[in-house]
């Protein structure tokens, strides 16, 4: 786009304009607005110095503003092509203590283990599915060539 090489600090995911963008983890909205080549940008601040950037957005989800708490899976914005972009896509970036890391290979902290009551509930809710999937073990499906 610029005619020269410039560091790219994230990963781009092509998607149609308006595709929902979801928070990748529980966080607080640090920034939601326009910022240079990112165009419309949301920055989420997670625990322990982690931040995630979501760039080139067409619009922000209702209520997304600095200070707002979001949960993993909440819709925060919509894919677009704002800023320096040749087509609609999501620019996704992970930063730790301000330094960018490759989102596809960065080692992130795991989730805390479930409390005993939550684990029991999870196992109860998944038992029937586990049984159904168990029936498929050893099953060979015929296919037409």
Regions found by a protein language model. Name each.
Residues 1-128:
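Catalytic cores of peptidoglycan-degrading enzymes
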Residues 124-145:
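C-terminal recognition in membrane/secretory proteostasis and scaffolding
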